[in-house]
Amino acid sequence: MKILLSNDDGVGAKGIAVLYQALMQIAEVTLVAPDRNCSGASNSLTLLNPLRATKLENGFISVNGTPTDCVHLGVNQLVDEMPDLVVAGINHGANLGDDTLYSGTVAAATEGRHLGLPAIAVSLCSHHGEHFETAAAVTISIIKGLASHPLPKDQIININVPDIPLSELKGVQVTRLGARHKAETMTKQTDPWGRDIYWYGSLGTESDAGEGTDFHAINNGYASVTPLSVDMTANESIKAVGEWLADLEINRAG
């Protein structure tokens, strides 16, 4: 098996190093990651500047771009053979609920799927994580399961793992995305030159963390596995929207 590994925390992050060592036990791994922390980059691309890839002494490849850039460049230019799987992580911090809209980790996996490859994103639910080995073990187990249960072509898997020893993990649960309340108000400060600067507030608290959600699984000692659809069409609304569109004046003209 050949795996392309990336992340959004940067090529020097602990999470990706731990996952690389674990994946090397089951596959050939090419690591292509941003040269800096790109948390919150979502699916952004570098379009107005050239990308540069630098091979480091440890064999990892550092790119002056986003997580999506790394996967796109890796698949199209930096590997000798097409990977069998794209893996993104281990992220330093949860990607639960609507976090997934902003996550560079989830975006890296999504780019793999856009390129026609199976893809998974994995996160450890602590920004100061200690038990990356737990997330790595869960990832290996999921990859082995995917070998006989492949994902549909328009889906990826989003894995979140509590920051606990593997011996304390209760298991793995399939979940749906929960939700958070809106983030706290932005903070306004003044820089040394007297100019206004702004900081994002803390993440919102859980607003939908009931049974069956990714939040609920994590809060109860389980790893969460959420299938995500790359096609964001709200199919259940097509008929209703079509009906009121038909009544618009622009559709009645002539």
UniProtKB/Swiss-Prot annotation:
Pfam families: SurE (PF01975). The keyword Hydrolase applies. Its EC number is 3.1.3.5. Its cofactor is a divalent metal cation. Keywords: Cytoplasm, Hydrolase, Metal-binding, Nucleotide-binding. InterPro entries: SurE (IPR030048), SurE-like_Pase/nucleotidase (IPR002828), SurE-like_sf (IPR036523). It is found in: Cytoplasm. Belongs to the SurE nucleotidase family. NCBIfam families: PRK00346.1-3, PRK00346.1-4, surE. Nucleotidase that shows phosphatase activity on nucleoside 5'-monophosphates. This is 5'-nucleotidase SurE. It comes from Pseudoalteromonas translucida (strain TAC 125). The lineage of its organism: Bacteria, Pseudomonadati, Pseudomonadota, Gammaproteobacteria, Alteromonadales. The gene is surE.
